[in-house]
């Protein structure tokens, strides 16, 4: 569960290290974002000579949340951190690698490129 002003880790090699959530997309009064939702974020930390710079405003898709996520079969999944992947306006990842596991719910939200790059889908 991500809301405005949440700090997230970045799970790709776009060069950003920390993101600061500015807005949750999808409705004028939407408060929270879960796995597979898109947010607008500011880059708080970045590596030198990277594709994104500190202070850039980017879009990101949430791939892991520390708040547990209920599945239709009654099971729950929860991760150790809140992480996102920086995406462009065509909903494709800016980086070429994804680090760590991602949730299966991304498949239903049509983020197939992220699913294929991820080392593990839980």
Swiss-Prot record:
List the Pfam families hit by this protein, alphabetically. Ribosomal_L14
Keyword Transcription regulation assigned: no
List cellular component terms (GO): cytosolic large ribosomal subunit
> Does the record's keyword annotation contain rRNA-binding?
yes
What Gene Ontology molecular function terms does this protein carry?
A: large ribosomal subunit rRNA binding; structural constituent of ribosome
Q: Which UniProt keywords apply?
A: Ribonucleoprotein, Ribosomal protein, RNA-binding, rRNA-binding
Alphabetized InterPro entries for the sequence: Ribosomal_uL14 (IPR000218), Ribosomal_uL14_bac-type (IPR005745), Ribosomal_uL14_CS (IPR019972), Ribosomal_uL14_sf (IPR036853)
Q: Which superkingdom heads the taxonomic lineage of this protein's source?
A: Bacteria
Q: Name one GO biological process term.
A: translation
Purpose: Binds to 23S rRNA. Forms part of two intersubunit bridges in the 70S ribosome.
Similarity section: Belongs to the universal ribosomal protein uL14 family.
Which HAMAP family does the record associate with it? Answer: Ribosomal_uL14
Q: Subunit composition?
A: Part of the 50S ribosomal subunit. Forms a cluster with proteins L3 and L19. In the 70S ribosome, L14 and L19 interact and together make contacts with the 16S rRNA in bridges B5 and B8.
Return the NCBIfam families for the record: rplN_bact
Recorded protein name is Large ribosomal subunit protein uL14
Q: Gene encoding this polypeptide?
A: rplN
